[in-house]
Amino acid sequence: MGSQVNDVEEVVQAWYMDDDDNAEEDQRLPHRRQPDDLLPLAKLLDLGLVAMRLDADNHEHDENLKIMREQRGYLHMDIVELTPEKMPNYEVMIKRFFEEHLHTDEEVRYCLDGSGYFDVRDENDKWVRVSVRKGALIVVPAGIYHRFTLDTNNYIKTMRLFSGGPDWTAYNRPHDHLPERKKYLEALHNRTPRFGQLHRIRSKME
């Protein structure tokens, strides 16, 4: 299991963000605390996230991706690129993505190229920044407050996976009354074990 975690940590890293809420600060900077200790992947799993590494160069024929999609019921997908060259309203859009929100379904993103940051709230409402690079697949659970931004490379190509028709509705904070939010908080407070879930997925893929 240790080697699997190390493989994932090459493309997924996480740390607590600094407390600088200055609107003038570039959201695309790392915003690490000092000292900038990395968090173990188990912390992400405790928060309900799933992180794994797949072969991005072979995504069209990757049996591991196929198995993972079958196991989790991801029947549909599309591929999007975020970059100033392909989005005339790029700066407006990344500001919109950076607004704190939640979804009523899990958000699944597979980084095929480039890089970016997912920020998620921990159990004490602190921001955890999750860096994803090529090969990283991350599942953000329904009901968790989060946001997304590109980093200073200003480019990411992602596969979006979903089980039903795509519903990108974002509920900006506060939306604590939603059932999905209540279910997430219940699972978080009960410390529902998730590391085993990741292990089962990976063991069936190998």
Swiss-Prot record:
GO terms for biological process: L-methionine salvage from methylthioadenosine; methionine metabolic process. Ni(2+) binds at residues 101, 103, 107, 146. Gene3D superfamilies: Jelly Rolls. Catalyzes 2 different reactions between oxygen and the acireductone 1,2-dihydroxy-3-keto-5-methylthiopentene (DHK-MTPene) depending upon the metal bound in the active site. Fe-containing acireductone dioxygenase (Fe-ARD) produces formate and 2-keto-4-methylthiobutyrate (KMTB), the alpha-ketoacid precursor of methionine in the methionine recycle pathway. Ni-containing acireductone dioxygenase (Ni-ARD) produces methylthiopropionate, carbon monoxide and formate, and does not lie on the methionine recycle pathway. It comes from Oryza sativa subsp. japonica (Rice). The gene is ARD3. This is Acireductone dioxygenase 3. Fe(2+) binds at residues 101, 103, 107, 146. Binds either 1 Fe or Ni cation per monomer. Iron-binding promotes an acireductone dioxygenase reaction producing 2-keto-4-methylthiobutyrate, while nickel-binding promotes an acireductone dioxygenase reaction producing 3-(methylsulfanyl)propanoate.
